[in-house]
């Protein structure tokens, strides 16, 4: 169970880093938002899901 928690935290950190870089780039590029809107929403949904997963796994470990 600890390995799953560590992998979920690692995935959350990687996803956060990717979103931290990609979202401002999408907003700054001309015509970037309309062409990459689905990618940003998918990344945000993945991030929210990982936050809940880390919270659930943390409550099971502690």
From Swiss-Prot:
Transmembrane parts of this sequence: 8-28, 41-61
One Gene Ontology CC term in the entry: chloroplast thylakoid membrane
InterPro entries: PSII_PsbZ, PSII_PsbZ_sf
GO biological process: photosynthesis; photosystem II stabilization
Membrane-topology descriptor: Multi-pass membrane protein
Assigned keywords, A-Z: Chloroplast, Membrane, Photosynthesis, Photosystem II, Plastid, Reaction center, Thylakoid, Transmembrane, Transmembrane helix
Main location per the UniProt record: plastid
Coiled-coil ranges per UniProt: none
Highest taxon of source: Eukaryota
Cleavable signal peptide: none
Matching SUPFAM superfamilies: PsbZ-like
Annotated localization: Plastid, Chloroplast thylakoid membrane
Function of the molecule: May control the interaction of photosystem II (PSII) cores with the light-harvesting antenna, regulates electron flow through the 2 photosystem reaction centers. PSII is a light-driven water plastoquinone oxidoreductase, using light energy to abstract electrons from H(2)O, generating a proton gradient subsequently used for ATP formation.
Family per similarity comment: Belongs to the PsbZ family.
Subunit structure: PSII is composed of 1 copy each of membrane proteins PsbA, PsbB, PsbC, PsbD, PsbE, PsbF, PsbH, PsbI, PsbJ, PsbK, PsbL, PsbM, PsbT, PsbY, PsbZ, Psb30/Ycf12, at least 3 peripheral proteins of the oxygen-evolving complex and a large number of cofactors. It forms dimeric complexes.
HAMAP family, per the entry: PSII_PsbZ
Full protein name: Photosystem II reaction center protein Z
Organism this protein belongs to: Arabidopsis thaliana (Mouse-ear cress)
